Amino acid sequence: MYIGRCLDSILEQTYQNLEIIIIDDGSSDRTGDICEKYLLEDRRIKYFYQENRGQSVARNNGVLRCTGDWIAFLDSDDVYLPYSIEVMYNIQKATNADIVLTSIGNFNNTYNTSINSQYLKEIKLYTLEVALEEMYYGKTYGVSPLAKLYPRSNLLSNPYPEGKIHEDMDTTFKLISCASKIAVCDIVTAVVYFSDNSTTRTKFNERMLYFFEAIQNNIVFINLNFPHNTSLISAVIYNEVFGGIDICGKMIDFKLYDTVDYYRKKYRKYFKTILFNNRISVKEKVKYILFISSIRYFTIVRKIYNLRLSRNG
């Protein structure tokens, strides 16, 4: 069971002064039984059950239930490395930051289970504009709630939209914007495992369409507050286009060609912005050109890629 692996990673943290809130979102497997076992073994754990109301409600409920001033999220599929909370806590203390942003790793890679204080020399303090630009490109960190340390007060003021998929797209930029001091460190703290239920692997669901509304809210915010920052505008366009292409790929599987065609036409206007952006890889540019040029060839290449992905687990 993934939840056991997840909880073990939290209990093994080098920083022990934790309040551990589990929100069981209507699980139909043995999750409840497993959590009850952990509950008896560690007094720091608090367990709450909700009737399958979704990830956003679970996060919001966790924020409401906790009593600490700082919060880190972790999904049941994933794990924190043993030093993760200590690292984020130390970064916050060293910088007095209002948010701490670290990196997410992939389970296929190998990571050290211990760390020295060298990372404290690699902390960067970002302006809001730089922090948002880096978030949209997602190289060090992205919109995912994982591997971040948030003040509880900001999460209470900016709850996750309920009943949506890609709800973090509409929330993370607000949480970063709340911060007067933003600390970033390119150190992996969370490791993600892609199960069959992961958003990246699930089939199309109408709730995924919320991405387009959420990214539009980001665009409005950027254009309103930073209308002359062309590099930031290019970054949010990058996220809009490639996030949208991924969802359109899922829509193609359901033969929703009219909707896909709408976004193909819309994204064509970004041709120069995408092609002349040196932060976008050649592979991504080819993907973009295929998408706006031919649904047929885009679909063929996507199927080949997904086949290789499934073979590699």
Segments and roles (model prediction):
Residues 71:
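Short aromatic/hydrophobic "clamp" motif used to bind/position activated sugar donors
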Residues 1-12:
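Short, well-formed alpha-helical segments that are part of the catalytic scaffolds
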Residues 252-313:
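Membrane-interface aromatic/basic loop that binds lipid-linked glycans or pyrophosphate carriers
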Residues 16, 24-33:
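A conserved acidic beta->alpha catalytic loop
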Residues 189-195, 202-230, 241-274:
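Catalytic core of nucleotide-sugar-dependent glycosyltransferases
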Residues 50-66:
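Glycine-rich, basic loop-to-helix element that forms the pyrophosphate-binding segment
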Residues 55, 76-183, 193-206:
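Donor-binding/catalytic cores of nucleotide-activated saccharide
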